[in-house]
Amino acid sequence: MNYIPTQTFYGRRWRPRPAARPWPLQATPVAPVVPDFQAQQMQQLISAVNALTMRQNAIAPARPPKPKKKKTTKPKPKTQPKKINGKTQQQKKKDKQADKKKKKPGKRERMCMKIENDCIFEVKHEGKVTGYACLVGDKVMKPAHVKGVIDNADLAKLAFKKSSKYDLECAQIPVHMRSDASKYTHEKPEGHYNWHHGAVQYSGGRFTIPTGAGKPGDSGRPIFDNKGRVVAIVLGGANEGSRTALSVVTWNKDMVTRVTPEGSEEWSAPLITAMCVLANATFPCFQPPCVPCCYENNAEATLRMLEDNVDRPGYYDLLQAALTCRNGTRHRRSVSQHFNVYKATRPYIAYCADCGAGHSCHSPVAIEAVRSEATDGMLKIQFSAQIGIDKSDNHDYTKIRYADGHAIENAVRSSLKVATSGDCFVHGTMGHFILAKCPPGEFLQVSIQDTRNAVRACRIQYHHDPQPVGREKFTIRPHYGKEIPCTTYQQTTAETVEEIDMHMPPDTPDRTLLSQQSGNVKITVGGKKVKYNCTCGTGNVGTTNSDMTINTCLIEQCHVSVTDHKKWQFNSPFVPRADEPARKGKVHIPFPLDNITCRVPMAREPTVIHGKREVTLHLHPDHPTLFSYRTLGEDPQYHEEWVTAAVERTIPVPVDGMEYHWGNNDPVRLWSQLTTEGKPHGWPHQIVQYYYGLYPAATVSAVVGMSLLALISIFASCYMLVAARSKCLTPYALTPGAAVPWTLGILCCAPRAHAASVAETMAYLWDQNQALFWLEFAAPVACILIITYCLRNVLCCCKSLSFLSATEPRGHRQSLRTFDSNAERGGVPV
């Protein structure tokens, strides 16, 4: 909780032990003491003289004390002390001594002043101290009702969090001021505690002080225990006779508690008294000292006075004083006190476009305005009748008073009905206002049943489509769920900061008051105040409260209107204005918009199946539930839908992340993990597969580049091998009788000569070298074994001799021969 400060361990009167030095201290060598023989002799001499003096005093006899002389005082004649302003000089001296004794603070007060010197700061408004702010733990606390700014440059610029529940404003203490803060404690054994004005008694969970010890301006002062810890902060007090009960904010073990005795008043210092004016004379608005300042004594003059002061700061104090006629005395407020302002107002008849039968009329229940700022779907309806007060200006919550012609009639509140597409549930009523929760619809109707059992109704076109609280369309508030912030119209009749304008009603013409009697016109007022203006004769203009007859006149020559300037009515655009439209009054309206928390259900958690860069959600809603998701990258993409049945949704999860929100559950954020197939340290194809899953474009580029490099290397190697073979075999081909070495023949795959056939060659080998003949049969077997081994291990790099011989161009083939000494044969092929 923000209003429970954290204990700090910075003591003002405690000095910590200095830090130990990490290096050993080296002992400084002590200089040798040189004995001073002269000083020793002088000391011995002084000791001997002192001993001799003490011995002589002991031997001398003690003298008896001298007898004290008694002072003889002459009797003085008694003189009567002079009286100054009804008090003698002695009494005046005693009063001064008593004042001096009172001004000297006691032990408790001195201790509190010593602690308060560091942890308390004045709150000033226009240079005047209105209260105090206190540093407790790691927070600075100031009563919310204290107007002004803390008299400290660092604390004045802090951002405070306000709590109307505890009447506190709280902010974090700057780091450099934490050493000045006081500790707090929740331990409060019964006994006496200390504050600025002395002792505070704590008993039965209440803090009390002697009456007169505290006063307005002490709001925000702390109460300390004997260890200097804060146990409570004073907000105000309630006078209970000899003692005053304090209204405080204190701490329990795990929570903050506000103790407010009955009848307690806030102890912020009063600001400049608001002044009102009457006939060029000023007076305090809350205490009018004039005769027409009571509505019950002179209603019309009182309303005129209120209209003259409508724009002054103390207007509502003047209104309260004029309606209660308290003249400075304070009255206990009650629920009926909130309805007291309506005795200066009256219901009225206004134009209504649809009176329930498809035609317009002047209805006593005309709808003026409909407000729907509340997020919970509550409607605040204003209409022309008044609820909670009867026609005798008495508070009665079972009555509705409405205008019936010039008269005011009562109806039963239970006959009030509000409807849209269906009947609405009425939550609260007061004055001109109704609180109701209605189903969706395209119109709004308000109706009552009058004294003749006739239905008086008014209907207006109004589109009402209440949005659900939260993200689920539920019909019944659950027992368990989640608390989310919302707004509603507070169901209280107390005064609010909202207000409506009132004005004096105009004169209403009424020809029914005129009757023709044998050439004369009779005006029957019926207890009303009537203005008349007849053109027959002279002087037939005026105002009357009783029946009168105008001689020798016709009804057509007279104009009669009922005037009533004893009550205000709402300044409606559907009602004619009075003769002076600039004059108006104001009254507070009930049911303010309040920030609260609403309990909403929580949808069942979805079943989540994770995939590769995607997630699959199985959604099972109990009622229409909103499902939405969005990406978390630089360009977020948002999607939402209302889910009414069990569905399955697969949504992508990019690398930047994704957030999905299901119903009133907390949003969930997911990021795709860098996973892929293959192995980073496996076979080549596994390595390629692994990196292709992570970086597909880079992997393809790398594989293509390596393949091109390998092909270029292979072609270059083949070209270099062919060139080297040609360079190696050309000299032997051009040199007659040159023999190719067998190693070079194997490396260069030298082709055999075509001088003799296979049979001739085999016959020659049989005759000349039979060992080589048998090796010729072993050569095919060896070739088969080599080819099999190469195919098995896939390590064959060279082509077969016949393949290289077949691929070589025919024109470039050379026959290698070797010759002996027989010139006729021309040589023998090898």
Swiss-Prot record:
<dbReference type="InterPro" id="IPR009003">
    <property type="entry name" value="Peptidase_S1_PA"/>
</dbReference>
<keyword id="KW-1170">Fusion of virus membrane with host endosomal membrane</keyword>
<feature type="glycosylation site" description="N-linked (GlcNAc...) asparagine; by host">
    <location>
        <position position="533"/>
    </location>
</feature>
<dbReference type="GO" id="GO:0030430">
    <property type="term" value="C:host cell cytoplasm"/>
</dbReference>
<keyword id="KW-0812">Transmembrane</keyword>
<keyword id="KW-1015">Disulfide bond</keyword>
<keyword id="KW-0449">Lipoprotein</keyword>
<feature type="disulfide bond">
    <location>
        <begin position="119"/>
        <end position="134"/>
    </location>
</feature>
<dbReference type="GO" id="GO:0019031">
    <property type="term" value="C:viral envelope"/>
</dbReference>
<keyword id="KW-1035">Host cytoplasm</keyword>
<dbReference type="GO" id="GO:0055036">
    <property type="term" value="C:virion membrane"/>
</dbReference>
<dbReference type="InterPro" id="IPR002533">
    <property type="entry name" value="Alpha_E3_glycop"/>
</dbReference>
<keyword id="KW-1162">Viral penetration into host cytoplasm</keyword>
<keyword id="KW-1165">Clathrin-mediated endocytosis of virus by host</keyword>
<feature type="site" description="Cleavage; by host furin">
    <location>
        <begin position="333"/>
        <end position="334"/>
    </location>
</feature>
<keyword id="KW-0945">Host-virus interaction</keyword>
<protein>
    <recommendedName>
        <fullName>Frameshifted structural polyprotein</fullName>
        <ecNumber>3.4.21.90</ecNumber>
    </recommendedName>
</protein>
<dbReference type="GO" id="GO:0016020">
    <property type="term" value="C:membrane"/>
</dbReference>
<keyword id="KW-1043">Host membrane</keyword>
<keyword id="KW-1161">Viral attachment to host cell</keyword>
<dbReference type="Pfam" id="PF00944">
    <property type="entry name" value="Peptidase_S3"/>
</dbReference>
<feature type="transmembrane region" description="Helical">
    <location>
        <begin position="702"/>
        <end position="722"/>
    </location>
</feature>
<dbReference type="InterPro" id="IPR000936">
    <property type="entry name" value="Alpha_E2_glycop"/>
</dbReference>
<keyword id="KW-1164">Virus endocytosis by host</keyword>
<keyword id="KW-0720">Serine protease</keyword>
<dbReference type="GO" id="GO:0019062">
    <property type="term" value="P:virion attachment to host cell"/>
</dbReference>
<keyword id="KW-1160">Virus entry into host cell</keyword>
<feature type="active site" description="Charge relay system">
    <location>
        <position position="219"/>
    </location>
</feature>
<feature type="lipid moiety-binding region" description="S-palmitoyl cysteine; by host">
    <location>
        <position position="749"/>
    </location>
</feature>
<feature type="lipid moiety-binding region" description="S-palmitoyl cysteine; by host">
    <location>
        <position position="728"/>
    </location>
</feature>
<dbReference type="GO" id="GO:0006508">
    <property type="term" value="P:proteolysis"/>
</dbReference>
<dbReference type="GO" id="GO:0005198">
    <property type="term" value="F:structural molecule activity"/>
</dbReference>
<dbReference type="GO" id="GO:0020002">
    <property type="term" value="C:host cell plasma membrane"/>
</dbReference>
<feature type="glycosylation site" description="N-linked (GlcNAc...) asparagine; by host">
    <location>
        <position position="327"/>
    </location>
</feature>
<feature type="active site" description="Charge relay system">
    <location>
        <position position="167"/>
    </location>
</feature>
<dbReference type="GO" id="GO:0004252">
    <property type="term" value="F:serine-type endopeptidase activity"/>
</dbReference>
<feature type="compositionally biased region" description="Basic residues">
    <location>
        <begin position="65"/>
        <end position="107"/>
    </location>
</feature>
<feature type="site" description="Cleavage; by host signal peptidase">
    <location>
        <begin position="755"/>
        <end position="756"/>
    </location>
</feature>
<keyword id="KW-0946">Virion</keyword>
<feature type="lipid moiety-binding region" description="S-palmitoyl cysteine; by host">
    <location>
        <position position="748"/>
    </location>
</feature>
<feature type="region of interest" description="Transient transmembrane before p62-6K protein processing">
    <location>
        <begin position="728"/>
        <end position="748"/>
    </location>
</feature>
<feature type="glycosylation site" description="N-linked (GlcNAc...) asparagine; by host">
    <location>
        <position position="280"/>
    </location>
</feature>
